[in-house]
Structures are given as C-alpha cells and as structure tokens.
C-alpha cells in the first residue's frame, strides 16, 4: 500500500466494487441506491496498493447531531472495508489514522460509527456511546394491544413523530423532511417495508417471515404490534428503557471518538469532553447505522 487519499470521481465505480467485495450480502439494488443518494467521491477515503489498485474504503458522512441540547457537526463513519485478499495487514487502521486530521479539517468535532467489533474500535480511540436493546421482540408483551390502523408513509408526519420521540434523548441525528423522503425511498427497495400508523412508524428489512426493524419511533408498541400481526418474528432496536419490556438484550449500538474537544463541549457546561460524553451516555439514542 502506498497511498491513502480521497478518491477521484473516476474511481467511484471502483469504490462500488470494493463495497461489493466487502459486503457481499448487500443487494446490487441497495448498493446502487447508496452510492446515488448517501455517499459521493469526496466523502470516500480510499487505500491504494503499490500498483494503484483501490483495496479499501472508509466513508466520511457529514451529520449534525443533538449533543446535550446543542447541534454539533460530526462525522459518521460507514462502509469501512478492505478487500478480502488484503485483510489483516493493518489497512483499516491506517485509513482511520489518515481520516482523523481530515475530519478535523472538515470541521467535525467528533466521529461516530456502528461497531462490528467493539474491541477493534476501542483500540482506535472510540468508546461506547449509544446503548440499545437489540434482538427478537417478545411478542407476548403485545397481546391485547389493539391492531392499529395503517396510514400511507408521510415524510412530514414522520419528522414530527421522530422529533417528539427523540426530545428526551441526546446523540441523535438532526433530520429534515428530505431525510425521511430518502428513507421512504430506501425502504421501498426489494426486501424492505415501511409501516406507519397515526402515531408511529417503522422501517424494516424482511428476511423470510422475520421483520428486522431498522428504526421505529413514536408509540413503538403500535408499530411493533402491526408487524407482529404480519410476521412470525420481529427483531428490533429499541431504547434501553424498553429493553426489559420487550425482552431484548442491551448492546453497544454506536461508538464515539472526540476529534475537537473545544467545539464538542462548547455551550454544554462541561470543562472536558470526557465529562460531557460520560453525561451524554446516560440518555444517548441513535438509529444511524450507515
């Protein structure tokens, strides 16, 4: 490997090739959507072999989150992958080391990601931030809940539900109508479904007779009841305060690394990032995966 840099427009198809090799379970339909709507060449850090072949990528996605009641610009890291033939050579770690100064240059005060391996990212300076209940829902807790009426997905209503649901929490992405329009489009792809009631919504991926809930907000009991009436099992991510209610295990969902301490703690009342992050963890919630 002799180069780690932001890829060029002419290398964008190569980045898609790397994604396919690194994440073979993703459909071509989803990959095409992701590269058309969620990322772009200037957001992709690439690792190149000595002969100039793209062998690894790391996506630096700009986000704005609510952090202790204040908007903060962060970098959400996604699509970290090295082609199978070049793994276990320290390439992913090298990409992260190259990414940190670039993140600061671009004005990000922190980096957040969903870990595939908590220990790996802890070695890179990340720490657990968002915990969530993740697993198969105990549908017995939904017995007796009236089956809700279904309404057509509506981006404006989803945004209103999301904002109200997230208000007690911190660490969540600040969204707009366009974000929900994109999510509705994404979850209209093959193998996905969106369900919405008057006071809740859920974005799901379907595997056989199982609904895997990517995100659910509002009165989540109503959307989960609706899904339980359609599928034999429902797996979901829920805030930790619902973990016992739905019988799911609490796990690390997102990790954080401080990039610019002064910017992160500005207006929070804390004198160090360590104190601010420790306090934020108590009520942190996010649905972002990629």
Residue ranges, per PLM feature:
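Conserved acetyl-CoA pyrophosphate-binding loop and the N-cap/start of the following alpha-helix
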Residues: 86-98, 219-227
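Glycine-rich, histidine-containing beta strand-loop boundary motifs that form or position
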Residues: 114-117, 124-125
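Conserved GNAT acetyl-CoA-binding A-motif
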Residues: 96, 101-115, 231-240
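Residue-level recognition of the GNAT/N-acetyltransferase active site
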Residues: 83
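Short amphipathic alpha-helix that is part of the acyltransferase structural core
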Residues: 1-62, 69-76, 142-178, 208-211, ...
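Short hydrophobic/aromatic beta-strand element in the GNAT-like acyltransferase core
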Residues: 42-46, 57, 79, 191-196, ...
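Amide-forming acyltransferase catalytic core, primarily the GNAT-like/NAT-type
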Residues: 127-223
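Active-site/acyl-donor-binding loops of N-acyltransferases
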Residues: 125-143, 205-208, 213-290
């Amino acid at each position: 490997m002799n180069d780690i840099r932001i890829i060029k427009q002419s290398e964008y198809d190569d980045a898609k090739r790397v994604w396919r090799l690194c994440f073979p379970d993703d459909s071509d339909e989803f990959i095409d959507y992701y590269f058309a709507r969620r990322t772009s060449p200037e957001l992709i850090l690439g690792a190149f072999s000595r002969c100039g072949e793209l062998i690894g990528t790391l996506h630096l996605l700009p986000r704005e989150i609510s952090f202790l009641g204040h908007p903060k610009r962060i970098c959400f890291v996604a699509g970290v992958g090295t082609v199978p033939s070049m793994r276990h050579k320290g390439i992913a770690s090298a990409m992260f080391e190259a990414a940190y100064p670039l993140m600061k240059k671009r004005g990000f005060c922190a980096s957040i990601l969903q870990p595939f391996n908590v220990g790996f990212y802890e070695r890179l300076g990340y720490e657990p931030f968002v915990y969530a209940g993740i697993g198969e829902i105990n549908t017995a807790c939904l017995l007796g809940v009236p089956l809700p009426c279904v309404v057509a997905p509506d981006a404006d209503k989803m945004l209103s539900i999301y904002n109200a649901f997230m208000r007690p929490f911190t660490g969540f992405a600040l969204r707009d109508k366009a974000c929900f329009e994109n999510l509705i489009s994404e979850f209209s792809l093959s193998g996905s479904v969106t369900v919405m009631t008057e006071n809740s919504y859920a974005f799901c991926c379907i595997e056989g007779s199982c609904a895997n809930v990517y995100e659910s907000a509002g009165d989540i009991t109503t959307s989960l009841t609706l899904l339980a009436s359609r599928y034999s099992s429902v797996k979901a991510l829920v805030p930790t305060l619902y973990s016992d209610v739905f019988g799911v295990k609490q796990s690390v969902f997102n990790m954080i690394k401080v990039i610019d301490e002064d910017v992160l703690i500005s207006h929070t009342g804390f004198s160090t990032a360590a104190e601010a992050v420790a306090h934020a963890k108590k009520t942190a919630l996010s649905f972002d995966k990629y």
